[in-house]
Amino acid sequence: MAGAAARRETRPMPTFVIRLTAPRPSFAMDMTDEEREVMGRHAAHWGSFIEAGRMVVFGPVLDGQGSWGLGVLEADAEDEIKAHAAEDPVVTTGTGTIEVGTLLTGFVRP
């Protein structure tokens, strides 16, 4: 039961979910060179969260409708994530949009 108890422990920071909506469902498979460059800058933009160990998962998701981007990360406040998302090259270039949500509760493996 120690493993189950550990999974029930609260996270040290709130957890947030970001969803990137691309300009078309096939975006992950058929990016132009310009879009690929923007996506490289997008990944670098979130690098500080990855390097700090605050990004739980980050990358494209394929489903029956196409693709979209997912990030699950820890931060002090939702405003921090919203401000960072607003400066994302995907958003500033109009390549896509980013939505931010708060994970209210759940389980995270240790």
Where on the chain are the PLM-derived regions?
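Conserved, structured core segments of small domains
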Residues: A2-P110
